[in-house]
């Protein structure tokens, strides 16, 4: 339980933190154990996409870097909740960890939106908008997204985020009831950081589904795979981000008393914990469903087997060379694995597409 001062002078709220302190460690440990290795692999596969001149890799790498930044802040938050919401580090570290926690949401939303728009342009308008589907354009968009969130972060650095409760606990990034300056930034976050991107994302995936249904060169099984991927992407996106933003808006509009803050505290913090699972869902949805990723995993597995066997027998390099026919042959035999939204159907390719130029080679479905 903590007695948290909202503005250090006028009002304090005593709120039971028991549920938050019970659930948060479980979520943080799960995201650390699963999310860190998954995002490291995702970063590697994003690099391979960039190496193949696929602009999708730029968005994947930026999305993964944002997730890794947040994951690296989790040990601090884990210590915080295990110490009964008592921040034992400096004020600046609280601000940095808080920024990594909250801004990761909007950086992730931004890059997920970019990926959806990029896939829509590739599928629905394969012969147009080439200038928007280049590495240079992707880097430019990425710079804008990071700059927007860094500028927003400066706003938080101007305010004190570590306050002391009646038990001399130093609480971090918690103000109850919500402060006036927070309302303005929350409205901005809801409208620009969530509502606009989700409208773009939903419109993009609706356009992808429409284009796939109209495609006569795509097998029904592959159409079903794409539809399942799109549906799961939207459902996971909404599950991770919608509850938090609904409650963020509710708090910003109506929270003016301690009683209201107490009433929404558990639901608000539960919804905030849900956003953490996006760090696990991102690499699964956007990397591990790709056929090229299956192929790269086979090659990576072959390399690891080569290293381990070599250390024992000294002959593994001949048995399991990186990219050996055994590994690539397996991928070839599984040519029906879904490339889904990371590749273009041959019917959509132009003479400029790689293996001839500007689009990724392969199939959409």
Swiss-Prot record:
It is a multi-pass membrane protein. Keywords: Amelogenesis imperfecta, Cell membrane, Disease variant, Disulfide bond, G-protein coupled receptor, Glycoprotein, Membrane, Receptor, Transducer, Transmembrane, Transmembrane helix, Tumor suppressor. GO terms for biological process: cellular response to pH; G protein-coupled receptor signaling pathway; inflammatory response; insulin secretion; monocyte differentiation; negative regulation of monocyte differentiation; osteoclast development; positive regulation of insulin secretion involved in cellular response to glucose stimulus. Changing residue 118 to A: Increased proton-induced G-protein coupled receptor signaling. Residues 1-12, 85-89, 161-176, 255-260 are extracellular. Changing residue 17 to F: Decreased but not abolished proton-induced G-protein coupled receptor signaling. Failed to stimulate IP formation at pH 6.8, activity is restored at more acid pH. Abolished response to shear stress. CDD domains: 7tmA_GPR68_OGR1 (cd15367). Changing residue 50 to N: In AI2A6; uncertain significance. Changing residue 149 to Q: Mimics the protonation state; more easily activated by protons. The record marks 149 as: Required for activation. This is G-protein coupled receptor 68. Changing residue 174 to A: Abolished proton-induced G-protein coupled receptor signaling. GO terms for molecular function: G protein-coupled receptor activity. Proton-sensing G-protein coupled receptor activated by extracellular pH, which is required to monitor pH changes and generate adaptive reactions. The receptor is almost silent at pH 7.8 but fully activated at pH 6.8. Ligand binding causes a conformation change that triggers signaling via guanine nucleotide-binding proteins (G proteins) and modulates the activity of downstream effectors, such as phospholipase C. GPR68 is mainly coupled to G(q) G proteins and mediates production of diacylglycerol (DAG) and inositol 1,4,5-trisphosphate (IP3). It comes from Homo sapiens (Human). It is linked to Amelogenesis imperfecta, hypomaturation type, 2A6: A defect of enamel formation. The disorder involves both primary and secondary dentitions. The teeth have a shiny agar jelly appearance and the enamel is softer than normal. Brown pigment is present in middle layers of enamel. Activated by a network of residues that connects an extracellular-facing cavity to Glu-149, a conserved charged residue buried in the transmembrane core of the receptor. Protonation likely drives conformational changes in extracellular loop 2 (ECL2), which stabilizes movement of transmembrane 3 (TM3) and a series of rearrangements that connect the extracellular-facing cavity to Glu-149, a residue only conserved in proton-sensing G-protein coupled receptors. Belongs to the G-protein coupled receptor 1 family. InterPro entries: GPCR_Rhodpsn, GPCR_Rhodpsn_7TM, OGR1_rcpt.
């Amino acid at each position: 339980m903590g007695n948290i001062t909202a503005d250090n002078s006028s009002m304090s709220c005593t709120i039971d933190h028991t549920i938050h302190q019970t659930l948060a460690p479980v979520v943080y440990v799960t995201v650390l154990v699963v999310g860190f290795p998954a995002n490291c692999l995702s970063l590697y596969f994003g690099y391979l996409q960039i190496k193949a001149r696929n602009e999708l890799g730029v968005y994947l790498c930026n999305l993964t870097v944002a997730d890794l930044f947040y994951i690296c802040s989790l040990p601090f938050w884990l210590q915080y909740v295990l110490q009964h919401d008592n921040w034992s580090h400096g004020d600046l570290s609280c601000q940095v960890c808080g920024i990594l926690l909250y801004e990761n949401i909007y950086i992730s939303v931004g890059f997920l939106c970019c990926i959806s728009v990029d896939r829509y342009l590739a599928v629905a308008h394969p012969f147009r908008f080439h200038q928007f589907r280049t590495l240079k354009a992707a880097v430019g968009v990425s710079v804008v997204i990071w700059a927007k969130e860094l500028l927003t972060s400066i706003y938080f650095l101007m305010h004190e985020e570590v306050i002391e409760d009646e038990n001399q606990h130093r609480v971090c990034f918690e103000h109850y009831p919500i402060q006036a300056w927070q309302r303005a930034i929350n409205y901005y976050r809801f409208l620009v950081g969530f509502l606009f991107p989700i409208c773009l994302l939903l419109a993009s995936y609706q356009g992808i589904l429409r284009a796939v249904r109209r495609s006569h060169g795509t097998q029904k099984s592959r159409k079903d795979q794409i539809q399942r991927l799109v549906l799961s992407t939207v459902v996971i996106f909404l599950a991770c981000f919608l509850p938090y933003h609904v409650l963020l808006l509710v708090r910003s509009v109506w929270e003016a008393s301690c009683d209201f803050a107490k009433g929404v505290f558990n639901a608000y913090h539960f919804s905030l914990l849900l956003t953490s699972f996006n760090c696990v869902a991102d690499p699964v949805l956007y990397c591990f469903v790709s056929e090229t990723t299956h192929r790269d995993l086979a090659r990576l597995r072959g390399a690891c087997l080569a290293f381990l066997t070599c250390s024992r027998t000294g002959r593994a390099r001949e048995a399991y060379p990186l990219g050996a026919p055994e590994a690539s042959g397996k991928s070839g035999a599984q040519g029906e694995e879904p490339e889904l939204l990371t590749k273009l159907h041959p019917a959509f390719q132009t003479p400029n597409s790689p293996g001839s130029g500007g689009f990724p080679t392969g199939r959409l479905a």
